[in-house]
From Swiss-Prot:
Native source organism of the sequence: Arabidopsis thaliana (Mouse-ear cress)
Residue ranges of PPR repeats: 91-125, 126-160, 161-196, 197-231, 232-266, 267-301, 302-336, 337-371, 372-406, 407-441, 442-476, 481-515, 516-550, 551-585, 653-687, 688-722, 723-758
NCBIfam families, per database record: PPR
Recorded GO MF terms: mRNA binding
Protein name: Pentatricopeptide repeat-containing protein At1g79540
Cross-referenced InterPro entries: Pentatricopeptide_rpt, PPR_P_subfamily, TPR-like_helical_dom_sf
Domain of life according to the entry: Eukaryota
Keyword Iron-sulfur attributed: no
Family per record: Belongs to the PPR family. P subfamily.
This protein's UniProt keywords: Repeat
């Protein structure tokens, strides 16, 4: 319809505006229409009917222009709400502009007043107008207000659309404690027949990956593809980044190539994410190979990429290359940011160049970058690691005078170091300082001090500190949250009580540092070390009443504690009573080790067979065949069969083999132990230094010196440095044998090249040998 024809049809209802009397030209049309809209806003009440005839002539630019020029913010909000009902008039510019207006003084209050006026006047509102309000609250860090706005949509007879759900989900996924609530909202979205889109799944998967919940993220991806939604470039990048975060760089690389073949060409974010994944694992050869391939495709290495590579080189202890790469980066006029400075300071600290790290830290302000808490913490940790506790403490005090105020991590580093050096009282003083400064101690801070108190034998004080953590959080709320699961939040969201659910979670998050399973494990370990196994078992019951679940460390600690006090039967009862933890290899290894110490090698062997069957690595027939071989004394055949299965499944674990080897030594079955050693060496499976020590000592005692020398040479070939005691025993045994005197000379040359202090060892053994010979002659 031509403009002139349209206005003839509506002219009877409205007086002719001045701009319509002029000729219609594209050059000044938008300006004229904007002026007419502002005139209507100033003169007409209500504005909505007067604006309707202008709809065909309005554009996104005009909407933004009017909102920007309107002096009365409330009228600007009302105009935005009216215009946003039409999707073609929505734009990022107007959306962002209104967010800025809401962020100003009383902006949100004026917006709510506008919404209330519209409701009173019977004017309907669209969910889009709530999206902008929720986004504004989120931008200002007022998440509770954002949730409240979402919850109040029903008051305005306004149903959220997928865009609104995406906005509120993004707010909730930022905090781990609100995960349950986010998924309750997602479930409500599905119940309301509001179909999630690609961005919904992207928000949920990104949040899940960032919190380490990779299996849930994978389920979400499967749900997305099951709905016929294909991933786009952003989704692929989220998946690649998530896989890299959990250490699955190879899977991420496959997905990267799949992304390329699907037509979603990776951008710099995806390239950097994959590069960072390999760097985090220290696989620098592959990282640089990837970089070469990327550069062939036109990728240009920037600050993010350089930071990942430098960090990876530091992790791989390739310090020289890391600094060379940093120098190359500077030559390309790429300036480091706070993240790279932190990486460099950490790298220098790990390389033992603490003075250089301090210089870099002090030079940052002159480069226009203020050191943050992470930078200071890296240096403080390095100083404390070298035992320079006073210097670390001084830097913490210096830090207090800057904008980078010490955080819970700073105090935890100092407390750990103090406790490690036996300075528990000083650690307690630092802990007191935290509370006085208004900085809340984290769970890790509490755990560090509890551990220090336990190791110094102050179990009563450690228990009181745990109680102090518990007092900070209402148990009833904790139990309600830990036992109810998502169901209670689903109900609250469905009934419109989303704000109450949010406040419950926020209260839970803000009421102090609740003891976690690590807190209890530290204390249980303290009681076990002190021989108070009954006190440790009571703590097991307490933590379960608090809604916590014991983990493999809990059971491993208790099983070890029970064995130490000779309560073997109870240890096995505890083991068999908890099916969940029969899957943990650590618990199995612990029981196997204790069984071997009591010379029950067959029991240890059968335990591992049960573990393999439990995790479906072994079928019953094969397991029975291997067990029968071991029972009948065919140890080598059983061992080779197991190694063959482990290698085939790519699940080779060193633990059971070394436990059996040491167990055979402890049982005096050195012939079989030597056979295990030979098979492991043949299969290129590393035999641990403790296993070698047991073998050498036992073989020397049985005068099997050739075999003992063979094992010792193996340790030299693998750069193991054994303690002087076993080396002295070997040399002493060789010197007592007249046939082995020549070998002593050859062996000491090898030892000297390996860094052993041969002179002192040899002098000691030769002196001992001569004294022995002298005594023999006297006796004769």
């Amino acid at each position: 319809m031509k403009p002139q024809m349209f206005f003839r049809s509506v002219i009877q209802f409205y007086s002719k505006p001045s701009w319509m009397q002029r000729s219609y030209s594209s050059g000044n049309a938008e300006f004229n229409i904007s002026g007419e809209v502002i005139s209507i806003l100033a003169k007409k009440k209500p504005i909505e009917p007067a604006l309707e005839p202008l709809v065909p002539f309005l554009s996104k630019n005009i909407i933004t222009s009017v909102i920007k020029d309107e002096v009365n913010r409330q009228l600007g909000f009302r105009f935005f709400i009216w215009a946003s009902r039409r999707e073609r008039l929505r734009s990022r510019e107007s959306f962002g502009l209104v967010i800025d207006m809401l962020s100003e003084d009383n902006g949100c209050d004026l917006y709510w007043q506008t919404l209330e006026e519209l409701k009173s006047g019977g004017v309907s509102v669209d969910s889009y107008c709530f999206c902008v309000l929720i986004s504004a609250y989120a931008k200002m860090g007022m998440a509770e207000k954002a949730v409240e706005s979402f919850g109040r949509m029903k008051e305005f007879d306004c149903r959220p659309d997928v865009f609104t759900y995406n906005v509120i989900l993004r707010v909730m996924m930022r905090e781990e404690v609100f995960f349950m609530l986010a998924f309750a909202v997602y479930n409500e979205m599905l119940k309301c027949n509001c179909s999630p889109n690609l961005y919904t799944f992207g928000i949920l998967m990104d949040g899940l990956y960032k919190k380490g919940r990779t299996s849930d993220a994978q389920k979400m991806f499967d749900d997305m593809t099951g709905r016929g939604i294909s991933p786009n470039r952003v989704t692929y990048t989220i998946l690649i980044s998530g896989l890299c975060q959990r250490g699955s760089a190879d899977d991420a690389r496959k997905l990267f190539y799949e992304m390329q073949t699907s037509g979603n060409y990776p951008d710099s974010v995806a390239h950097n994410a994959l590069l960072d994944g390999f760097c985090k694992l220290g696989r620098m050869v592959e990282a640089f190979e990837l970089l070469r391939l990327f550069e062939k495709d036109g990728f240009v290495l920037g600050l993010r990429g350089y930071s990942s590579l430098i960090d990876g080189l530091f992790r791989a202890r390739r310090y020289t290359q890391a600094f060379e790469l940093y120098a190359n980066m500077l030559k390309k006029n790429i300036k480091p940011d706070i993240i790279l400075y932190t990486i460099l300071i950490q790298g220098l600290s790990k390389a033992g160049k603490i003075e250089d790290a301090l210089k870099l830290l002090s030079s940052m302000p002159s480069k226009g970058i203020s050191p943050d808490t992470y930078c200071y913490n890296a240096v403080i940790k390095a100083l404390c690691g070298r035992g320079l506790l006073e210097e670390g403490r001084s830097l913490q005090l210096e830090m207090s005078e800057t904008e980078s105020f010490p955080d819970a991590c700073t105090h935890t580093i100092l407390i750990c170091s103090m406790c490690r050096n036996g300075l528990v009282r000083e650690a307690e003083e630092i802990f007191t300082e935290i509370e006085k400064s208004g900085c809340s101690p984290s769970v890790a801070t509490f755990n560090a001090l509890i551990d220090g108190l336990c190791k110094s034998g102050e179990l009563k004080e450690a228990r009181l500190l745990l109680h102090k953590m518990e007092v900070g959080r209402p148990a009833s709320l904790f139990l309600r949250l830990s036992h109810s699961g998502n169901r209670s939040f689903d109900t609250m969201v469905e009934s419109g009580s989303i704000l109450k659910a949010y406040r419950d979670l926020a209260h839970f998050a803000d009421t102090g540092s609740s003891p976690d399973i690590v807190s209890y494990n530290v204390l249980i370990n303290g009681f076990c070390r002190a021989g108070d196994i009954d006190g440790a078992l009571k703590l097991l019951n307490v933590l379960q009443l608090k809604g916590l679940s014991p983990d493999s460390v809990t059971y491993n600690t208790l099983i070890n504690g029970l064995h130490r006090v000779g309560r073997e039967e109870e240890a096995f009862k505890l083991f068999y009573a908890k099916d969940d933890f029969r899957h943990s290899p650590a618990v199995y290894r612990s029981l196997m080790t204790w069984s071997c110490r009591k010379r029950k090698v067959l029991v240890a062997f059968n335990l591992w067979m049960k573990y393999l069957k439990k995790i479906s690595c072994l079928d019953d027939e094969t397991a029975n065949e291997i067990e029968q071989c071991f029972k009948e004394g065919e140890t080598e055949r059983a061992l080779r069969r197991l190694i063959e299965l482990d290698t085939r499944k790519d699940e080779l674990t060193l633990g059971p083999y070394t436990i059996w080897l040491i167990g055979l030594c402890q049982s005096g079955r050195f012939h079989e132990a030597l056979m295990v050693f030979s098979v492991l060496r043949e299969k290129k499976i590393l035999v641990t230094p403790p296993s070698c020590v047991k073998l050498i000592h036992g073989l020397c005692k049985r005068e099997q010196l050739d075999a003992a020398i063979e094992v010792f040479l193996y340790t030299l070939d693998n750069n193991f440095k054994l303690m002087p005691r076993v080396c002295n025993y070997l040399l002493s045994s060789l010197l007592e044998s007249t046939e082995k005197m020549e070998i002593v000379s050859q062996l000491t040359n090898r030892m000297e090249r390996a860094g052993y202090n041969v002179d002192s060892m040899l002098r000691f053994e030769i002196l001992k040998y001569h004294r022995h010979r002298k005594q023999v002659l006297i006796d004769l």
